[in-house]
Amino acid sequence: MRKTSSSLAKLSAIVTFQRFSIARGGAQQKRSLSAKKVTRERFESTKSSASLSKAGSMNDREGEEETITSVENVKVKRMVKLRTRRSFRDEERACVVSGGKVLLEIFQANAFGKMNGVECKRAFVSEEFDDDYNERIDRVIFRDDDDRKRKSTKVSAKVMKKVAGVENADNVDYCAEVTKPDVLEAREFFKKAKMVRKVLCLDGVQDPGNVGTLLRTAEAFGFDAVGLGPKTCDPFNEKALRSSKGSCFRMQMFSWKTSEEFFDALERGGKFERRKNVLAAMLVGENCLDVSKELGSVDADDAGKVCIVLGSEGTGVSKDIEENSRAMTIPTPGVTESLNVAVAGGILMMAFGK
């Protein structure tokens, strides 16, 4: 009887221990699953925050893709962010170009190509356009990637409106992410640049439409480079891009932060002379036609060498640049006090661009 009682007691203890072990194991399993869940959530959060950059770093090897119809697509979000945020454009060294015609002009130009770091990373094409049209443009903008068979991705009208930032997408056939050419600091630019004789400098020109128009005009009149001063609008801003018609990719550009840096770069690197051929557009100054004739008739290596500085319509050029430059003005017999900066720049570049 005692043996039986002892056996029952041992059996009870074993059962109790097993139940405890099972309960403990279940708790551990729950904690393990909970930890895995937290880790997974953290991973997903990190993955989401990095998705826009990942979308840009992918080389689009996926080939043909279904039409994108959602504005929440990660590639769509990236394109919108590139279009609207300068800091993101600078960080990614890329921008958004709208219009198949502009893209063709950019990539058919002999002035640059992949050697200058400009390439098409990805492109969206409206689903309204036929495949023959798409393939013709794709062959040009992806010309160095035939081995990867990269091609544009079709998108809905809703997505195209979002990416291009327009109210009506009927006339927008293409939107592409294109890498930006480098805008060098002024001193570095003039150390590397060769045969820079005609320069246009924008000192605080903030309107993107004016900046784009001035870039386009500078290219048209054969200017060699465009300088961008403090507070000047980003030339890769969507409106500036639209106005420049791709000139911002073909023109050499440099930037400066202080007037000291500006003049040091021009004089030491560019061999310009302040108060001689560094010319500031002012309301009061020498007649621009007389100055153009004088500088163009110099019997020396400096013949025709000129740097034109334009300021904002509201405040003009900065004080330091005004004091160290040669003031010139456009003769206007009418009663209008001043001209739009893009119009004034066009007149001056025509006068000195001969």
Predicted regions located by residue number:
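N-terminal mitochondrial targeting presequence
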Residues: M1-S53
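Structured adenosyl-cofactor binding patch, chiefly the S-adenosyl-L-methionine
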Residues: Y174-A176, T217-F221, T232-F249, S318-K354
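A glycine-rich helix N-cap at a beta->alpha junction
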Residues: D145-A164
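RNA substrate-binding interface of SAM-dependent RNA methyltransferases
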Residues: F142, S152-T153, E177, P181-C288
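Short, aromatic/basic amphipathic alpha-helical patches
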Residues: D132-D146, D320-I321
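Boundary-proximal intrinsically disordered activation/regulatory segments immediately upstream
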Residues: L33-D131, T232
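Amphipathic alpha-helical repeat scaffolds
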Residues: G99, Q206-L214, S338-A344
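Active-site/ligand-binding-proximal alpha/beta "capping" segment
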Residues: A281-T336
